[in-house]
């Protein structure tokens, strides 16, 4: 399965993606996101960690306003 980076505060999303069989990595900085197929960020500070630019090869999903299920669906559609 895919390697998904999830921002530290999104523990419910981390658990849901792990249950789906994904490798989940907690991202606290831009460096943590490297090598991830996709990253999920809170969007509270949309570019706080520099992840919104091209620092990773995968998609960046802004979790702001989305449910855990909606986030998981977006992850599945982008990997």
UniProtKB/Swiss-Prot annotation:
Signal peptide: none annotated. It comes from the Bacteria. HAMAP family: UPF0180. Belongs to the UPF0180 family. This is UPF0180 protein BCE_1513.
């Amino acid at each position: 399965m895919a390697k998904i980076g999830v921002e530290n505060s999104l523990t419910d999303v981390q658990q849901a993606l792990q249950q789906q069989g994904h490798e989940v990595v907690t991202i606290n900085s831009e460096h943590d996101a490297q090598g991830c197929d996709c990253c999920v960020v809170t969007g509270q500070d949309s570019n706080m960690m520099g992840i919104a630019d091209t620092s990773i090869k995968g998609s960046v999903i802004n979790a702001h306003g989305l449910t855990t299920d909606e986030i998981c669906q977006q992850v599945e559609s982008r990997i």
